[in-house]
């Protein structure tokens, strides 16, 4: 990451990761080489499933690194669970128990956000993000599910939400 970039900007970190894996994006968030539109989701907050604690977005942009005598700095493995805020993610209400407690207990206390649009910056409240500035003045509406690509994404998220925290290493 360049010194001029803010380490808390997870989008800049994501762009670097995409370049490193050889996947370039064109305007509109589409992957070059793939002509299908990929629905975008905004990261609300992240929970470390090992400890059951919420992580700040700054921690996800640059995870801690431990020295290794053979390879230099090595990023230790960390299981994370991405939580989306809003009523448009009903399949994410099903959770599995994890090391430090149950995510269902934390989720039961979460208020629903005003819409499914979340700010990319760290939210004012740790549980509910601000709206994106462009969305102010316009009502936020959920788009109807028409695309098989979106259905695939939803199915993948269902599978991910039911197994990530349940894995044991």
From Swiss-Prot:
* PANTHER family per UniProt: STEROID RECEPTOR-ASSOCIATED AND REGULATED PROTEIN
Q: Which GO terms describe its biological process?
A: positive regulation of intracellular estrogen receptor signaling pathway
Please give the record's induction comment: Up-regulated in breast cancers.
User: Could you say what the effect of mutating residue 100 to W is?
Assistant: In a breast cancer sample; somatic mutation
Q: In which tissues is it expressed?
A: Expressed in breast tumors with a higher expression level in estrogen receptor-positive cancers.
Q: Name one GO cellular component term.
A: cytoplasm
Q: What is this protein called?
A: Steroid receptor-associated and regulated protein
Q: Which InterPro entries match?
A: C1ORF64
Q: How does this protein assemble?
A: Interacts with 14-3-3 proteins.
As one GO molecular function, the record gives: nuclear estrogen receptor binding
Task of the protein: May regulate the transcriptional function of androgen and estrogen receptors.
